[in-house]
Amino acid sequence: MYTSRLLFAPVATALLAAAPALAQQQDFSKVQMTTVKVTEGVYMLTGAGGNIGVSAGEDGVFLIDDQYAPLTDKIKAAVAAISKKPIRFLLNTHWHGDHTGGNENLGKAGVLIVAHENVRKRMTTEQFIQAFGQKTPPSPKDALPVVTFTDAVTLHLNGDEIQAFHVAPAHTDGDAVVHFRKANVVHAGDLFFNGIYPFIDVDSGGSVDGMIAAADRILGVTDDRTQIIPGHGPLSHRAGLQSFRTMLAVARDKIQPLVDQGKTVEQVVAAAPTKELDEQWGKGFLTPDQFVRIVYSSMKKRPAGGGGGSR
């Protein structure tokens, strides 16, 4: 445990603001929701926390993620400016509080919450993320998903076939990708941090290998016209996700030999293995050193005999 605390201590400072238990300490009064029209009937909302996806049409409103509880009224106002129809469904792409913080408010309002079964499992039990040094207590009943799935679930709404499918553990063990088949839009959740190094929740089963494999799954359902809503960062496309995937693979392949040599995390960080990537990717909420620590940790937690995934 002492080694783990040392490993993640530098990460905690950058990420504490996103820890669910500390969300109440943030000043959300100044947060403004911004609406981006992705295509007819599909929108992206940005504010604080993960990007929100919106499907609006004759059948009502379907939300993907809901940021933090204090922002629920602002989210509702942004949705009302798009559609006068009620919010009927909410899907959580994973369990983290910057994507599920509004669940309780929406659940109490009668919104049906959907997620992968591991999201509900984690939300019903205490969680501890080393990077935050933060315990998250079980969520209240109204915040929990009431419909769960294992592999995939499809919603036939607003003239589209909207499929949410699970990927093998990547950012967490409960990640879901939402594919609007007709609109040709994908909400990738935190499987895609556009333009910045991603946080990978190793304590929730995440890994750099899983992130790369998840990017490949998403690329497999997209084409050059697909628009991709990332978990964090601006609206993107297939080329943007491919660039993110390439970065992850390069970082892994630079760090892997150092891990194989038995280097300590401090020695790996000192070697600056991501220096060729840092100018483009290292200016987000994770510094290059923090990202290297996370990748190192995910490699050290691989099962015996496990190696790198696809190239």
PLM region descriptions:
Residues 19-25, 220-224, 235-311:
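Accessory terminal helices/loops
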Residues 37, 60-61, 68-70, 120-167, 172-173, 181-182, ...:
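Metallo-beta-lactamase
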